[in-house]
């Protein structure tokens, strides 16, 4: 599977925003560059301030915490990128027309596992913000629902027509799949549970759990 590091992608896609002050723009550009080069956890705010040519206190006047600085960077990027990322993901997963739904699900889990291993720190912070920040939920959820949820519903309906999946509302089945996969990855990457070194065994366990709820019997 191809690599896709969000911080590196953000660095390559530097954006300017006319609504930002010059100092805030410099802080955000410096943060993207340093996060991509050194990793989020290895980049102190003092180093961001030095690279941006501002006092460290200036960062905290614009962003309450380093986490909030990252969120201010990643949310606009995700809103721009989710449509294309979703399109490319589903095109890749469905390129084998003879694939059954169970294999589709297995490949989806493998792909997203690799993606999250490359973006663990970002995933941890975004999940935390989803729990506690209603504004972030309202900003991102419509993009997730429109670009990922709707595609998953279409896939489910196609496999229902082939007789592989139960004749139940596709939207409800999509929620079951989405929350099962999301829960699996949150337990693994945020809470450090499901920490088996045998990732294929973890994937197979998740596939069996999901298929038990959607398989045509």
Outline where the language-model segments fall.
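Helix-turn-helix
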Residues: 26, 34-68, 72
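Amphipathic alpha-helical segments used for helix-helix packing
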Residues: 85-94, 115-136, 184-189
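Amphipathic alpha-helical packing segments from all-alpha helical-bundle domains
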Residues: 103, 114-118, 125-127, 134-162, ...
């Amino acid at each position: 599977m191809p690599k896709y590091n969000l911080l590196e992608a953000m660095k390559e896609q530097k954006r300017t925003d006319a609504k930002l002050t010059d100092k805030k723009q410099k802080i955000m550009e410096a943060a993207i560059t340093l996060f991509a080069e050194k990793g989020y956890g290895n980049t102190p705010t003092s180093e961001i301030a030095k690279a941006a040519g501002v006092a460290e206190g200036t960062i905290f006047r614009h962003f309450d915490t380093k986490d909030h600085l990252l969120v201010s960077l990643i949310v606009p990027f995700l809103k721009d990128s989710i449509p294309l990322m979703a399109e490319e993901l589903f095109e890749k997963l469905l390129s084998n027309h003879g694939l059954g739904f169970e294999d589709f699900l297995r490949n989806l889990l493998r792909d997203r596992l690799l993606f999250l291993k490359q973006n663990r720190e970002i995933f941890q912070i975004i999940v935390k913000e989803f729990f506690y920040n209603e504004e972030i939920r309202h900003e991102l959820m419509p993009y997730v629902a429109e670009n990922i949820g709707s595609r998953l519903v279409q896939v489910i309906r196609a496999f229902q027509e082939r007789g592989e999946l139960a004749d139940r509302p596709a939207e409800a089945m999509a929620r079951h799949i989405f929350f099962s996969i999301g829960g699996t990855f949150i337990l693994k990457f945020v809470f450090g549970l499901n920490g088996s070194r045998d990732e294929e065994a973890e994937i197979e366990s998740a596939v069996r759990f999901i298929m038990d709820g959607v398989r045509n019997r």
